[in-house]
Amino acid sequence: MGLSDGEWQLVLKVWGKVEADIAGHGQEVLIRLFKDHPETLEKFDKFKNLKTEDEMKASEDLKKHGSTVLGALGGILKKKGQHEAEIKPLAQSHATKHKIPVKYLEFISEAIIQVLKSKHSGDFGADAQGAMSKALELFRNDIAAKYKELGFQG
């Protein structure tokens, strides 16, 4: 299920564009996640009170958390599948502290793909979308395996 070198190049090329405005991308990803899957908002005590898209856009905390999420994901993507050291603490915190189900990781993966499609259509064609989908699936599968080791049925 690994990616080819060419697929990793496509992933990292578009990710460079994400990193140029990580806060903006992170904010958009979280807003899309919360709009498309409102149940995910319940996992975020800090954001539960944000009811409208305008409130979400005005939240510095949401923008900051979006940067944190995409920053961590970027670090994982740059490892090109050799991300054991990065995945382990992330799975630990998301299983034991935050209790984030794998399904929610699927939801945020969808949000990432949609945001990249809307912001970078010229650099995110079918090949790049397919490569990013595979990379995010690899990430989710590895998180799910760690969840299982930890006894979390997320």
Curated annotation (Swiss-Prot):
Its EC number is 1.7.-.-, 1.11.1.-. One of its GO terms (molecular function) is peroxidase activity. GO terms for cellular component: extracellular exosome; sarcoplasm. Heme b binds at H94. Nitrite binds at H65. O2 binds at H65. Pfam families: Globin. It is found in: Cytoplasm, Sarcoplasm. The modification Phosphothreonine is found at T68. Residues 2-148 form the Globin domain. Signal peptide: none annotated. It comes from the Eukaryota. Belongs to the globin family. This is Myoglobin. It comes from Sciurus vulgaris.
